[in-house]
């Protein structure tokens, strides 16, 4: 983002009842069930939902057993789809499962890395685990918010969470599970100065008045509630444009309104478009897949770097070759906000963080059933749950290594 001039930046979020998020939740709930019994399970589970049907496919190698149809139904019901009147019913929807085993050719590269097979390195357990795929992953942090996330996505997620809270608690009982939020922030250079526009689109019961009931309720119970909670004293919220269901009624929602797929909300899951994305989705993947574990690690690195005062904004990229333990590349971008030489920051990161896949799994304790809780409302900057990659436990060491 430019250091001077006024501009608008927009990010969106979706609720857990959005069709794509139903799929993410199912995939991650299956993953958690398998990791509970077998922490070394290899899991790649994809889900598709459409009218009256859930299809689960993928590759799993494990000693564990999971009752996948039950997990599917329980997840759908927990989200709130429990009646055909809402467009989907976890009690009666069809569930189709097509799960195979992980390719042995992929497994050999993860279990016995290139370093172990070709270079003869065998005494280091971390060096023996290779990356589960090639790819590039980004992490990002900024001083926009206390949780060091971009403000547009942080607010969009809070609005989506609040939509779900008022629905499930009965505050607004006429709401239904499907919904989306969007936040447009005016920036002056790198500083967020004004909340310009908020869009809230939510599924609802058929018999409600949009202008006289839904819009006032969402303004008071969702938007005002969130703004009061976050207490952004430096942000002008005096003249916010609120757009509620701009197309009109939104009764037909969920899988009946749109088919959903795992991994279709990767920008919602990360930084709302404020940072680059390597393209790999998270949900349904065990941590041997660097699409997931390395993206978490890079958020950990970026957040610690900003918390250490090395820069006000930082984006870090790591890249892997399938089967190799050591990353093939690391890149650091500070957008001119660095407090010391960027080369020194990059050197400090390599000294303090071990970015081999096995080390990431070890240091972030990722062989645990912690993933279903990340399936909606973002994987980063969460203030409602405790996630290991959000820790700033290495900020002091990083600051010292950078010479500050």
From Swiss-Prot:
Biological function: Catalyzes the formation of S-adenosylmethionine (AdoMet) from methionine and ATP. The overall synthetic reaction is composed of two sequential steps, AdoMet formation and the subsequent tripolyphosphate hydrolysis which occurs prior to release of AdoMet from the enzyme.
Binding annotation for ATP: 18, 178-180, 249-250, 258, 264-265, 281, 285
Positions that bind Mg(2+): 20
Name of the featured protein: S-adenosylmethionine synthase
A single Gene Ontology CC term: cytoplasm
EC number, UniProt record: 2.5.1.6
Organism from which the protein derives: Rhodococcus erythropolis (strain PR4 / NBRC 100887)
GO biological process: one-carbon metabolic process; S-adenosylmethionine biosynthetic process
Uppermost EC category: transferase
Major location (coarse): cytoplasm
Catalytic activity: L-methionine + ATP + H2O = S-adenosyl-L-methionine + phosphate + diphosphate
NCBIfam families on file: metK
Annotated compartments: Cytoplasm
InterPro entries to which the protein is assigned, alphabetical: ADOMET_SYNTHASE_CS, S-AdoMet_synt_C, S-AdoMet_synt_central, S-AdoMet_synt_N, S-AdoMet_synthetase, S-AdoMet_synthetase_sfam
Listed pathway(s): Amino-acid biosynthesis; S-adenosyl-L-methionine biosynthesis; S-adenosyl-L-methionine from L-methionine: step 1/1
Record SUPFAM superfamilies: S-adenosylmethionine synthetase
Family: Belongs to the AdoMet synthase family.
Binding site for K(+): 46
Subunit structure: Homotetramer; dimer of dimers.
Residues annotated to bind L-methionine: 59, 102, 258, 289
GO molecular function ontology, one term from the record: ATP binding
Note describing how the cofactor binds: Binds 2 divalent ions per subunit.
Residue span of region Flexible loop: 102-112
CDD domains from the UniProt entry: S-AdoMet_synt
Cofactor(s), names only, from the UniProt record: Mg(2+); K(+)
Keyword terms: ATP-binding, Cytoplasm, Magnesium, Metal-binding, Nucleotide-binding, One-carbon metabolism, Potassium, Transferase
Stored PANTHER family: S-ADENOSYLMETHIONINE SYNTHETASE (PTHR11964)
């Amino acid at each position: 983002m430019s250091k001077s001039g006024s501009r608008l930046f927009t990010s969106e979020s979706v609720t857990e009842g959005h069709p794509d998020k139903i799929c993410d939740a199912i995939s991650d709930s299956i993953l958690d069930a398998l990791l509970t019994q077998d922490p070394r399970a290899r899991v790649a589970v994809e889900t598709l939902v459409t009218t009256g049907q859930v299809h689960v496919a993928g590759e799993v190698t494990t000693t564990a057993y999971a009752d996948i149809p039950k997990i599917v139904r329980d997840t759908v019901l927990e989200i709130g789809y429990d009646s055909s009147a809402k467009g989907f019913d976890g009690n009666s929807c069809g569930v189709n499962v097509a799960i195979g085993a992980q390719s042995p050719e992929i497994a050999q590269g993860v279990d016995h890395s290139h370093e172990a097979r070709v270079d003869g390195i065998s005494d280091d357990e971390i060096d023996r685990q290779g990356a589960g795929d090639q790819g590039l992953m980004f992490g990002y942090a900024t001083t926009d918010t206390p949780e060091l996330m971009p403000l547009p996505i942080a607010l969009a997620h809070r609005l989506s969470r609040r939509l779900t809270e008022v629905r499930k608690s009965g505050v607004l009982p006429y709401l239904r599970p499907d919904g989306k939020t969007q936040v447009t922030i005016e920036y002056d250079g790198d500083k967020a100065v004004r909340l310009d526009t908020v869009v809230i689109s939510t599924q609802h019961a058929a018999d409600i008045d949009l202008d006289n009931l839904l819009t006032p309720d969402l303004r008071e119970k969702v938007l005002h509630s969130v703004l009061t909670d976050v207490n952004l004293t430096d942000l002008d919220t005096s003249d916010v444009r609120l757009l509620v269901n701009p197309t009109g009624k939104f009764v037909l929602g969920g899988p009946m309104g749109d088919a959903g797929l795992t991994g279709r909300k990767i920008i919602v899951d990360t930084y709302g478009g404020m940072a680059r994305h390597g393209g790999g989705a998270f949900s349904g993947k065990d941590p041997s897949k660097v699409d997931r574990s390395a993206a978490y690690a890079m958020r950990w690195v970026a957040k610690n770097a900003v918390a250490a005062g090395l820069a006000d904004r930082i984006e870090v990229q790591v890249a892997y070759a399938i089967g190799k333990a050591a990353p093939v590349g690391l890149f650091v971008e500070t957008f001119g906000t660095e407090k010391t030489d960027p080369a020194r920051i990059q050197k400090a990161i390599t000294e303090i963080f071990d970015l081999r896949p096995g080390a990431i799994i070890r240091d972030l304790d990722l062989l645990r059933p912690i993933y279903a809780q990340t399936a909606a409302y973002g994987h980063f900057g969460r203030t409602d749950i405790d996630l290991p990659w959000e820790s700033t436990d290495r900020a002091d060491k990083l600051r010292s290594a950078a010479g500050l």
